[in-house]
């Protein structure tokens, strides 16, 4: 993805590394500026590693069955055309269940607009990527998160923290549907602090 000036935005987009700021960001639209739609989009992005285009194009029926959140969803990625089966963890299912109550209460979900995040202005369409970008950057700026934060930061944050907690990079590559480990390596946004941590901790658990 490129900006109007031709700058490669994808390569400069940063994950949210700091755990406390990540928690504040995650809950911003739940605790600070209530908006369950925005909250659910952020939770989905942080917990599924889906691209924002795939999140916005999710339909109600892909997520809910008999008014309940499904344990897995299966999508065909817009960018790659690859099929991806994704487990919805507890945090994600809880957010989606709460969001469904909001959809029903406000009648936001109506026949004729199948999308999970229906546009309030355009019939039969989801909200736009620019709307998602604005709400993500607004939350990040309010919280004071450093670095270039964009919609893609949700996906990169998933990868970074999966790697930090010890997940196999090969498994992360498969989750991302990347064609090579070198692409995944760039997504992890490993910094000097991360390397320093490895140097400090090596052999600490070895027997004396």
What is the predicted function of each stretch?
Residues 1-208:
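Conserved catalytic core of the tyrosine transesterase superfamily
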